[in-house]
Amino acid sequence: MLKWALFFAVVAVIAGVLGFTGVAAGAAAIAKFLFIVFVILCVVFLVLGFVVTKKIVD
């Protein structure tokens, strides 16, 4: 689960860089939307990773 959280964090950063720097000016709105989606998914998978790990360890 933590691997997925890291994956979504990297994808969110890449989408943000492309969307906010003007590199892909035509797709900036799509990149901003994807940035928010991937940040939310990153947080969800990060929390799930910690919850599952805690249940496995206990």
UniProtKB/Swiss-Prot annotation:
Query: Got a GO cellular component term for this one?
Result: plasma membrane
Instruction: Note the NCBIfam families from the entry.
Output: PRK13682.1-4
Family indicated by similarity: Belongs to the UPF0391 family.
State its location(s): Cell membrane
Tell me which positions the record assigns to the signal sequence. none
According to its UniProt record, what is one Pfam family this protein matches? DUF1328
Q: Any keyword Flavoprotein?
A: no
How does the protein's chain sit in the membrane according to the entry?
Multi-pass membrane protein
For this protein, the record's InterPro entries field holds: DUF1328
Locate the transmembrane regions by residue number.
4-24, 33-53
Name of this chain's protein: UPF0391 membrane protein Bxeno_A2959
Q: Tell me which UniProt keywords the record has, alphabetically.
A: Cell membrane, Membrane, Transmembrane, Transmembrane helix
